A protein has these predicted regions:
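Short, surface-exposed loop/helix-turn segments at secondary-structure junctions
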Residues: 233-247
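Predominantly a Rossmann-like dinucleotide-binding segment in NAD(P)-dependent oxidoreductases
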Residues: 124-207, 212-216, 223, 236-238
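Beta-strand-loop-alpha-helix segment that lines the small-molecule cofactor/substrate pocket
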Residues: 62, 67-74, 78-125, 140
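Short, Asp-centered acidic motifs that coordinate Mg2+ and/or phosphate
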Residues: 33, 67, 147
């Protein structure tokens, strides 16, 4: 019988909690420990009967650790992730990889230098429907893709922003939500050649954007527009069409549109 993988969760916020629940039910993984300083983390430690560490260094000094999931605020991704990569501990890092390009490059560089697995949490590309669409595109069964349009309009209640990192540099719906859509459209259409983008914080007045539009040109010549806002009540977003999360109603309205031609 294969040994279970001992995984620690760094950060017990919204996504960290989801990982904790998933691992606790897994037949292939074991919940090794959690790292956080919140009162909620103390309660989770008692509930799941696992060690609680107050910082990454304490975890690194523990025994029998096989891998970690980093689910801390975006601004802390580099600091936490590189600490594990240097010790050659595989990391599943919640998206986005970081809050800026230089930091992202350092994380990737550390993974390559230490020859240690690093996976970013873009789970949507593993959806069976997305995988099938990818297969059909790659085999040319859908013809040539000329353009694509992606909508990500999902209203967020003001309580969502009680977490201050979400309204600080490195937060905002671009890094929290639209990164999923950008990853998936690139997964389907390939590498990007040109980018043009506009953002505004006109509605919420936070230090981060609440609305954005992005225009892309892919190496294939295909064009794409992505339209994002977390201030609009609307039926068009992946969350409302995929049915992955029971917390969201299913609208059956397409948030992704591909235009194709057969030559």
């Amino acid at each position: 019988m294969n040994k279970k993988i001992n995984i620690s969760i760094v950060g017990t916020g919204l996504m960290g909690l989801q990982h904790i629940k998933a691992i606790s039910k897994s037949k292939k993984a074991n919940l090794h420990s959690i790292v956080d300083i919140s009162n909620n983390a103390k309660n989770l430690s008692k509930k799941y009967k696992i060690p609680l560490y107050s910082n990454v260094d304490e975890l690194l000094n523990s025994k029998n650790l096989d891998a970690v999931i980093v689910a801390t605020p975006n601004q802390l991704h580099e600091k936490h992730t590189v600490s594990f990569l240097k010790k050659k501990i595989p990391v599943l890092l919640e998206k986005p990889i970081s809050d800026n390009i230089n930091s992202a490059k350092k994380i990737i560089g550390s993974a390559n230098k230490n020859k240690t697995p690093l996976l970013i949490g873009y789970h949507r590309r593993h959806n069976s429907i997305v995988s099938k669409v990818k297969e059909l595109i790659d085999k040319g069964k859908l013809g040539n893709i000329v353009s694509a349009n992606v909508l990500c309009w999902l209203y967020k209640h003001k309580d969502y922003y009680k977490e201050k990192w979400r309204i600080s540099k490195g937060g905002g719906p671009l890094g929290i939500n639209l990164v999923h859509d950008i990853d998936m459209i690139c997964y389907l259409l390939g590498s990007i050649k040109y980018v043009q983008a506009f953002t505004t914080n006109k509605t919420r007045k936070f230090a981060v954007e609440d609305t954005a539009t992005i225009s892309l040109i892919f190496n294939s010549g295909a064009l794409c527009t992505l339209n994002l806002s977390d201030t609009i009540v609307a039926p068009w977003s992946y969350e409302l069409t995929a049915g992955e999360n029971p917390a969201y109603p299913i609208t059956n309205q397409s948030a992704y549109m591909l235009s194709l031609i057969h030559i």
